[in-house]
């Protein structure tokens, strides 16, 4: 496939509202808790399986897995050591090996702050990894936890990623507010949206 080709997220109305996720996109989901990320990660993985994509899940955090074990998804366990360089190099080796057009899910980046005792290193990891993924026309989903990081760390991510989507939820609705959508043309992409998972609507 060609760079910046549209892909399917598994939520058709979200594709329409955001003018699609594209090859090369790093998609950061800023959430209050990881269940909010799962609302969007699960259909993304299910769609990628249907589309016979090369799907890789980077597993390094202590939280519950974000992707269920299945033969269609490669689960890569990367020990989350205190060494920024070692961890980053191991991730990049896998990305290089998997090559073009791969689809990724990363564990929560907020856990990097705990391991490295600073969230600026989390921002540095993203700033190094994101352009490499972009150069290989991949798609990658990353969750971060809202309110856990400094302005400077979040700014590094915001300046580097192609999409940053804020997700909020209550017992009745899931709300999405795009904070950054790069190189799209849609009248609705910066509007707040309500996602009703059971109905599949995103309006």
List where the protein language model places each region:
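Conserved inter-motif catalytic segment of the P-loop NTP-binding fold
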Residues: 51-114
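Phosphate-binding/switch region of NTP-binding enzymes
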Residues: 145-203
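Hydrophobic/aromatic beta-strand patches that form the interior of the parallel beta-sheet core
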Residues: 27, 56-58, 74-76, 141, ...
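Conserved nucleotide-binding/hydrolysis micro-motifs of P-loop NTPases
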Residues: 34-35, 61-65, 81, 109-111, ...
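Structural recognition of the conserved hydrophobic beta-strand(s) that form the central parallel beta-sheet
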Residues: 29, 57, 105-106, 138-146
């Amino acid at each position: 496939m060609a760079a910046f080709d549209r892909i399917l997220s598994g939520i058709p109305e979200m594709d329409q509202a955001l003018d699609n996720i594209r090859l090369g996109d790093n998609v950061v989901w800023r959430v209050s808790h990881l269940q909010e990320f799962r609302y969007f990660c699960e259909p993304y993985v299910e769609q990628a399986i249907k589309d016979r994509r090369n799907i890789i899940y980077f597993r390094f955090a202590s939280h519950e897995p974000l992707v269920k074990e299945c033969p269609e998804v490669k689960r890569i366990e990367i020990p989350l050591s205190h060494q920024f360089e070692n961890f980053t190099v191991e991730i990049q080796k896998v990305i290089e090996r998997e090559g073009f057009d791969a689809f990724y899910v990363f564990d929560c980046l907020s856990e990097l702050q705990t391991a490295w005792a600073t969230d600026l290193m989390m921002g540095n990891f993203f700033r190094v990894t994101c352009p490499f993924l972009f150069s290989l026309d991949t798609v990658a989903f990353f969750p971060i936890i809202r309110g856990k990081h400094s302005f400077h760390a979040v700014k590094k991510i915001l300046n580097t990623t192609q999409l940053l989507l804020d997700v909020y939820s209550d017992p009745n609705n899931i709300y999405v507010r795009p904070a950054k959508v790069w190189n799209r043309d849609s009248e609705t992409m910066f509007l707040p949206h309500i996602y009703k998972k059971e109905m599949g609507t995103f309006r």
